[in-house]
């Protein structure tokens, strides 16, 4: 509990320091906040997402997963974009037999979403998700190649942005895992580029026992968009979740801190200045 309080305190201090250093948030920054909440936005971006699970394993240690997840969009003409997302996990995993932890890399995920170039009321993306066998040890991932479908659905109505990222990955090998993932999100954008966010990640291990299948967290937090040096947009957010349903070995709480660096194109900057995102 002490570590959790320290983590939240550091995040709040960081938010306050950045907030006080910014003066006057333009309409374009509000539009940038909405853009950062769209997984299939045609924009280069570089998020760092840090997830901490508390009281994990028999010794009650913390598990930490830092996801480095660059997003690289490509135009396929006037009608469609291809949104490429890579997730590189760096995992600090507590031991199940000793009161120690170790750090390594997990299996890399690559997703390619085909998405319309022009946004409608319902924004969507669809494509494959691949799991690459890059885990540096069995404690960090299955180390098996996997593949499955992935879908993004969302809508933007006034100050609201809501939707979900859904995928299911089956791996091929001795373990042959079969796992489901849904990251649903609801954002409400506030004045001065602040926003409220709830974006829990719900997972299911289809091969686990019935009472061990699901991890269902519930919670949310706050975020803010600033411009570093007046030029580079950065979205920051902090969230806290309570695990309503969980398998054995996981604690009740988890936190997430995220930094989301954005690099909009010239045409996108013009759209944001006109409030067309």
Give the label of every model feature segment.
Residues 21-23:
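N-terminal signal peptide c-region/cleavage motif recognized by signal peptidases
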Residues 26-172, 176-277:
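Transmembrane beta-barrel domains of Gram-negative outer membranes and organellar outer membranes
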Residues 1-12:
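Bacterial N-terminal signal peptides that target proteins for export
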